[in-house]
């Protein structure tokens, strides 16, 4: 089996990274940073997000497992004290694959130049660089509303616990192949109206955001921030690809949510 280990970059994570490499090499596994079968991330959710974006071209062939040394390890199943146990599992135990849905984002330009396709594990946000975002929001080809406000957040089920949750969105189980649209400070008065509620779209529904004024847009894809001019539309839907996690023991989603946000009662 080919593996690689990525680190958050702090001393604790770097030490664990080197320790895991030594252990797995001693077990006869092959270190391969280009085409790994399994990616072990040491840090927090940000470390796993970086690893995901590095290996998006290998999602069908690569599984991820996280060790939590950060402040929030929603995607991490293991803690530093369990490193030796995890290494033995990786070297000797067949693992279960658990798949989570991803978000596909396609940015198209008014000059009909080549479109840009992106994948997000957590969310995509769309904002105007100059004041409020004013755009048509289409669902399945029909105009649903004219949105006016700070911006829109489109999240995956696993990403529903991140920025989406802070916006008052619902937490969705990753077994639901869906995306969620949440508003950022929408303008609602006698003249302008939006739905004012998060929307959950199933796998076969597409959301199309069409700016009504030609301003520069700020688009975030997870931890990346991009600037686009002359945007014709931003299309969001459930991606065909999925992220694959290597599971060596049960870790129920709702238990993960409770431990991340509520703690022990």
Curated annotation (Swiss-Prot):
Disulfide partners: none
Enzyme class (EC, first level): transferase
Active site: 45
InterPro entries tied to this protein: ATP-NAD_kinase_N, ATP-NAD_kinase_PpnK-typ_C, NAD/diacylglycerol_kinase_sf, NADK
Cofactors that this protein relies on: a divalent metal cation
Cellular compartments per GO CC: cytoplasm
The reaction(s) this protein catalyses: NAD(+) + ATP = ADP + NADP(+) + H(+)
Residues binding NAD(+): 45-46, 50, 122-123, 148, 150, 185
Keywords: ATP-binding, Cytoplasm, Kinase, NAD, NADP, Nucleotide-binding, Transferase
Short name of any one Pfam family annotated for the protein: NAD_kinase
Gene Ontology molecular function, alphabetical: ATP binding; metal ion binding; NAD binding; NAD+ kinase activity
GO biological process terms on file: NAD metabolic process; NADP biosynthetic process
EC number assigned by the record: 2.7.1.23
Domain of life, source organism: Bacteria
Entry's localization field: Cytoplasm
Listed SUPFAM superfamilies: NAD kinase/diacylglycerol kinase-like
Family of the protein in this entry: Belongs to the NAD kinase family.
Function: Involved in the regulation of the intracellular balance of NAD and NADP, and is a key enzyme in the biosynthesis of NADP. Catalyzes specifically the phosphorylation on 2'-hydroxyl of the adenosine moiety of NAD to yield NADP.
Protein name, UniProt field: NAD kinase 1
